C-alpha cells in the first residue's frame, strides 16, 4: 500500500494521544498516570491500524514513555526520593517484559513448532489421522479436529498451525472428488471440511495455554496487575470438561448444521497413504522430537510444583539443539518467533506500567462503585458476554487482548468476590472460542474464508451459531467446574 494513501494510519494514534492528553485529568488520578494512559491508548490504536508491524508500535510507545518518564511514568514523590535516578529506572522498566517467564515459554513453544515443521512430524500426524479416519466424511472431520488437538500444545501460532500445517493438507481433499472451489458442488465435502478446519483451530486455541500467543499475553497482563497467575496445568485442567465436550461435539454438530452431500469415499485415505509413502518411514529425529514433546507435556501438566513451565520449555529447546532436531540457525532465523517475542514482551511492559502508575487500581475503584449492588456472578457473566461480543470489532486477537483484557482484569479486581483465576481463564477461553465469530477474527480465518468453499452468508451464519453455543458452554463450565479446580 502506498504511504500517501495510508497516512491516516500513522496520524490516528498520535491524534488519540493528543486528544486524551488534552482532556482534564479525572478526579483521583495524577497527571503522569493520565498521560501514560494516553500513550498506552495510542499504542492500542496503532496495534489495531498497524501502520507498521505491531512490535514496532509497542517499542515506539515504550521509547516515548521511557524518554519522557519524569512526566509519564514516575510521580513527583518518586522523583523527589534521594538517590532516585529516573534514567536507570525507566530503562529497567522498558526492558522488564523480556524477563517475564511467559515470554520465554512462548518462545520455547515456537521452537517446538519449528521442530515439528522441519522434521515433518506435524504433517505426518495429520496424514496418519486422515488415512485412518478418512473413509467417512464425519470421521474425516474428527481427523482434522484431532490433528489440531495434537499440534496445538506445542504450536503457539494458530496461524502456523491452522494455515501452515492443516489447511495445506485439507485443501487437497475436495479435488480428489473432482470438486472445485466457488462451485455449486463445493457443498459435497469441501464446505464441511473447511468449516471444521477453522472451528478446530479456534477450539484448540482455547484448550491449551501455549496454543495461541494472546493466551500467554493474557497471563502476563494478569500477573502484572495482580501478581496472580495461571500455570499450564491450571489452564489445561480448568478447560478439561469443556475441551472434551467441544472436541467430541463440533464435528458432529457441523455435520448436522452444515451437512456434506458426500458421506463416504476411499479417495482421501488413498491420497493420504500415497503422501505418507512419499515421506518414508518415521526417522530418528521425528522419534526424538516426539519423545521430547511428550516429556514437555507431562512436566507442564504434572511438574508445576518442581519446575517452572518456562524452564521446561527452555530445557527442551536446549535438548533439541543438542540432539540436532533443530539448529542454532533455525532459532536465529525464526522471524515469527522473534516478532512475537518482541511485541509480547513490549505489551507486558506497557501493561506493567499501567498498573505501576496506579491506573488499574483507579479504574477498578471506579468500576466497583458502578457495579455495587449486583452479584459477583452476574457481573462476571456480564463482563464475559461483553468481552466475547466485542470480538466482532477486532481483526487481530493481539489487539483485542491488549485493548480489552486490562480493563476486564481491572473490573474483576474491583470486586474481590470475583475469583480472578476463574475469570481470567474464562476470558482466555473467550479469546480463542470467539475467533469463530467472523471471517477476519484471527489469522487462519481469512485463509479458510478465501478457500472458495465457505460462502459469505454461510460463514457469518455458522459463526453466530457456533459462537453462541461456545459462549453458553463456556459460561456453564466456568461457573460449575473451573472454581472446583482453580480455587
Curated annotation (Swiss-Prot):
Keyword Mitochondrion: no
Keywords in alphabetical order: Antiport, Cell inner membrane, Cell membrane, Membrane, Transmembrane, Transmembrane helix, Transport
GO molecular function, one term: antiporter activity
Subcellular location: Cell inner membrane
InterPro entries in the cross-refs: CitT-rel, SLC13A/DASS
Catalytic reaction list: (2R,3R)-tartrate(out) + succinate(in) = (2R,3R)-tartrate(in) + succinate(out)
TM region(s), chain numbering: 10-30, 33-53, 54-74, 93-113, 137-157, 189-209, 230-250, 292-312, 313-333, 340-360, 370-390, 393-413, 418-438, 465-485
Main subcellular localisation: membrane
Superkingdom of origin organism: Bacteria
UniProt KW Transmembrane helix keyword: yes
GO CC annotation terms, alphabetical: plasma membrane
Protein topology in the membrane: Multi-pass membrane protein
PANTHER family: DICARBOXYLATE TRANSPORTER 2.1, CHLOROPLASTIC (PTHR42826)
Function summary: Catalyzes the uptake of tartrate in exchange for intracellular succinate. Essential for anaerobic L-tartrate fermentation.
Family: Belongs to the SLC13A/DASS transporter (TC 2.A.47) family. DIT1 subfamily.
The protein's name: L-tartrate/succinate antiporter
Record lineage: Bacteria, Pseudomonadati, Pseudomonadota, Gammaproteobacteria, Enterobacterales
Amino acid at each position: 500500500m502506498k504511504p500517501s494513501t495510508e497516512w491516516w494510519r500513522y496520524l490516528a494514534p498520535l491524534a488519540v494521544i493528543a486528544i486524551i492528553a488534552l482532556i482534564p485529568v479525572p478526579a483521583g488520578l495524577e497527571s503522569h498516570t493520565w498521560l501514560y494512559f494516553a500513550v498506552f491508548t495510542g499504542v492500542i490504536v496503532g496495534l489495531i491500524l498497524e501502520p507498521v508491524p505491531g512490535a514496532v508500535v509497542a517499542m515506539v510507545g515504550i521509547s516515548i514513555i521511557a524518554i519522557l518518564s519524569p512526566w509519564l511514568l514516575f510521580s513527583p514523590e518518586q522523583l523527589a526520593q534521594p538517590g532516585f535516578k529516573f534514567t536507570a529506572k525507566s530503562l529497567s522498566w522498558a526492558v522488564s517484559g523480556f524477563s517475564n517467564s511467559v515470554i520465554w515459554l512462548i518462545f520455547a513453544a515456537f521452537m517446538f513448532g519449528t521442530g515439528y515443521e522441519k522434521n515433518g512430524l506435524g504433517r505426518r500426524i495429520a496424514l496418519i489421522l486422515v488415512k485412518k479416519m478418512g473413509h467417512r466424511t464425519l470421521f474425516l472431520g474428527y481427523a482434522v479436529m484431532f490433528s489440531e488437538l495434537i499440534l496445538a500444545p506445542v504450536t503457539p501460532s494458530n496461524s502456523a498451525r491452522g494455515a501452515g500445517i492443516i489447511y495445506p493438507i485439507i485443501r487437497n481433499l475436495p479435488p480428489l472428488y473432482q470438486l472445485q472451489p466457488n462451485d455449486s458442488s463445493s457443498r459435497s465435502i469441501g464446505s464441511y471440511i473447511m468449516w471444521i478446519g477453522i472451528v478446530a483451530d479456534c477450539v484448540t486455541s482455547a484448550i491449551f495455554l501455549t496454543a495461541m500467543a494472546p493466551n500467554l499475553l493474557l497471563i502476563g497482563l494478569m500477573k502484572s496487575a495482580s501478581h496472580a497467575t495461571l500455570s499450564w496445568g491450571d489452564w489445561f485442567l480448568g478447560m478439561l470438561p469443556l475441551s472434551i465436550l467441544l472436541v467430541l461435539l463440533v464435528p458432529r454438530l457441523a455435520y448436522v448444521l452444515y451437512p456434506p452431500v458426500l458421506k463416504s469415499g476411499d479417495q482421501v485415505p488413498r491420497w493420504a497413504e500415497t503422501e505418507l509413502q512419499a515421506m518414508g518411514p518415521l526417522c530418528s529425529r521425528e522419534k526424538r522430537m516426539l519423545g521430547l514433546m511428550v516429556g514437555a507435556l507431562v512436566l507442564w501438566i504434572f511438574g508445576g510444583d518442581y519446575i517452572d513451565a518456562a524452564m521446561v520449555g527452555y530445557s527442551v529447546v536446549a535438548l533439541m539443539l543438542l540432539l540436532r532436531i533443530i539448529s542454532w540457525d533455525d532459532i536465529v532465523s525464526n522471524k515469527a518467533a522473534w516478532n512475537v517475542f518482541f511485541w509480547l514482551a513490549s505489551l507486558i511492559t506497557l501493561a506493567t506500567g499501567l498498573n505501576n502508575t496506579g491506573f488499574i487500581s483507579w479504574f477498578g475503584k471506579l468500576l466497583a462503585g458502578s457495579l455495587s449492588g449486583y452479584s459477583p456472578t452476574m457481573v462476571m457473566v456480564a463482563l464475559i458476554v461483553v468481552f466475547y461480543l466485542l470480538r466482532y470489532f477486532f481483526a487481530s486477537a493481539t489487539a483485542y487482548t491488549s485493548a480489552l483484557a486490562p480493563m476486564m482484569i481491572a473490573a474483576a479486581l474491583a470486586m474481590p468476590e470475583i475469583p480472578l483465576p476463574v475469570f481470567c481463564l474464562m476470558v482466555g477461553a473467550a479469546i480463542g472460542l470467539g475467533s469463530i465469530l467472523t471471517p477476519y477474527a484471527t489469522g487462519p480465518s481469512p485463509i479458510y474464508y478465501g478457500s472458495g468453499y465457505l460462502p459469505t452468508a454461510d460463514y457469518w451464519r455458522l459463526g453466530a451459531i457456533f459462537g453462541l453455543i461456545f459462549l453458553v458452554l463456556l459460561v456453564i463450565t466456568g461457573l460449575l467446574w473451573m472454581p472446583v479446580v482453580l480455587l
